[in-house]
Amino acid sequence: MPELPEVETLRRDLLIHLPGERVVGVEVLRSDSVGYPADPAIFIEQMQGQIFSDRMLRRGKYLLLYFARGAALGVHLRMSGRLLWRCGEAPLEPHTRVRIPMASGHELRFEDMRVFGRLWLIPVGVPPERVMGGLTRLGPEPFAEMFDGPYLAGRFAGRNQPVKSALLDQQLVAGVGNIYADEALFSSGIHPALPVGGLDAAALERLHRAVVKVLEAGIAQRGATLRNYTDAQGINGNYAGTAWVYGRKGQPCRVCNTPIERIRLAGRSTHFCPTCQRAQQSVQ
């Protein structure tokens, strides 16, 4: 699933291409790719003539692309979605679900192999949270001032949940997924199975700094491509090639040469270095 760095990369790409583009036609090839309005015909009708503004926001893994008249196109890529900026004459990708042609001859295409992603058209004056319910359940942005060691201490107090599982909770912090959770735990030297309630203030401060650091690195590398993710031009991200632990089972740790191990925590594949991330306390 695309995480914060991948969605932020996409936002920055679209900010280059979309402002001033006028929608001249919409084709919905898969009706369940449109979350709102429920009737794709209404979605198509209300998209006609919309002009994209330069107001393009990211909240966690969600995108909000605003139009000049105040409506917005909401996007969540989920597992395998892609937003692609294409010349209108370019062949359709195999899993294209929605086409949004522009007056310039270009198209914004929503491609989604697994069909979990969604587009929403948010009417003028309607809070996005009323249409995109997931926005109401998001915690702070990782780059927000309130996201720090003491914030983590308050949220983790008395809890026995593995720290890896806690980091994936979007109500704790918005935008962190499997890749960058593993990377942050390696960077902070914390074993992924340790109970969050047992982490001291120093460990939580390291973890806070590590989350910010690996997300910034992911953005700088234009995201991580493991299966489906590409940027708006269809180009793969570069982070996976420089990852510390994620996707590197059996390969030597880049710090100590110990083979990277993979376990499952709460049903999620989890990578770590058993030397750099020792289980320093018992895990029940």
From Swiss-Prot:
GO terms for molecular function: 8-oxo-7,8-dihydroguanine DNA N-glycosylase activity; class I DNA-(apurinic or apyrimidinic site) endonuclease activity; damaged DNA binding; DNA-(apurinic or apyrimidinic site) endonuclease activity; zinc ion binding. Its EC number is 3.2.2.23, 4.2.99.18. One of its GO terms (biological process) is base-excision repair. A zinc finger (FPG-type) spans 244-278. HAMAP family: Fapy_DNA_glycosyl. This is Formamidopyrimidine-DNA glycosylase. Involved in base excision repair of DNA damaged by oxidation or by mutagenic agents. Acts as a DNA glycosylase that recognizes and removes damaged bases. Has a preference for oxidized purines, such as 7,8-dihydro-8-oxoguanine (8-oxoG). Has AP (apurinic/apyrimidinic) lyase activity and introduces nicks in the DNA strand. Cleaves the DNA backbone by beta-delta elimination to generate a single-strand break at the site of the removed base with both 3'- and 5'-phosphates. It catalyses: Hydrolysis of DNA containing ring-opened 7-methylguanine residues, releasing 2,6-diamino-4-hydroxy-5-(N-methyl)formamidopyrimidine; 2'-deoxyribonucleotide-(2'-deoxyribose 5'-phosphate)-2'-deoxyribonucleotide-DNA = a 3'-end 2'-deoxyribonucleotide-(2,3-dehydro-2,3-deoxyribose 5'-phosphate)-DNA + a 5'-end 5'-phospho-2'-deoxyribonucleoside-DNA + H(+). DNA binds at H95, R114, R159. Belongs to the FPG family. CDD domains: EcFpg-like_N (cd08966). Its cofactor is Zn(2+). Gene3D superfamilies: 1.10.8.50, MutM-like, N-terminal (3.20.190.10). Keywords: DNA damage, DNA repair, DNA-binding, Glycosidase, Hydrolase, Lyase, Metal-binding, Multifunctional enzyme, Zinc, Zinc-finger.
